[in-house]
Amino acid sequence: MSSHRQSPGRRYYPALLDLEGKRCVVVGGGEVAERKVQSLLECGAQVVVIAPQATQAIGDLARQGRIGLSVKSYTRGDLGGALLVIAAATPDVNARVAADAKRDRVLVNAVDDPEHCDFIVPAVARRGPVLIAISSHGASPALSRRLRQLIEGCVGPEYGDLAELMGRLRPEVIAIGDEDERRRIWEAILDSRALELLRDGRRDEAELEARRCISSARD
C-alpha cells in the first residue's frame, strides 16, 4: 500500500482490474458516488454503498437488488471483505475512510484527493472491447477528459468492431505454430480494407477480407 503522500514524481502503475464478483464499497450517496457505482456495476462488481442519504438512482439500484445499501454514516469496520473502496463523501469522511483502508489493506480512491489515493481512475474511451485510458496522474482531470474527447473523435466504433472480429479469428490464428507468421497475419489484417468495410457497416465483407489475409499469409 502507498503511504498516502502525494509527491511531485509520483507515478502510478497502469493496470486493468477484474472486479467480477468482487466486493467494492462506495462511501457517499451523492451524484459523484452514483457515477462510481454505475462504473463498478459495468465491471460486474458486487457494490455496497454506505451513506446516510443517497440519490434516487442509488436507491432504485438497491431496491432492484443490484447493489447493497447501508443507510448510515460510515464507521470503522465497514470495509470488511472489500477489494477496494471509493470515498465520495465529505473531505473529513474521505480521510477517515482512507486511513481505515490503509490499516485494512484495502485499495482506496478518495475523490479529488490524490494524497489519499492508492489508485486513481483514468478518463476512459470505450469502443467495444477496446478501452483507451488517459491519465494526468491526478494533475488535471479536466485535461484527461479533453484528451479523451479528442481520442473519441479520432477512434470511431469501427475500431471496436475490428477488435471483435480479430477476437473471433484469434483461435484460428493462434493455432498457427509460427510466431512470425501470426504477427504477419495480424499486421496484414490491420493494413487491409477490413477497417474501412466495418466503418461502412459491411461486416460480412470485412470478415472475408480478414480471412483472405489469413489464407494469403499461409500460402
Residue ranges, per PLM feature:
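E1/E1-like adenylate-forming module used to activate ubiquitin-like modifiers
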Residues: 110-160
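Hydrophobic beta-strand scaffold residues
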Residues: 47, 69, 107-108
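Short loop/edge segments at beta-strand edges and connector loops
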Residues: 51, 69-73, 112
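Residue-level detector of alpha-helix initiation sites
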Residues: 31-32, 92, 138
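ADP-ribose/adenylate-binding Rossmann-like module
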Residues: 84-90, 94-121
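Glycine-rich, highly charged phosphate/nucleotide-binding loops
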Residues: 62-80
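Hydrophobic, well-ordered beta-alpha structural blocks that scaffold small-molecule cofactor pockets
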Residues: 1-62
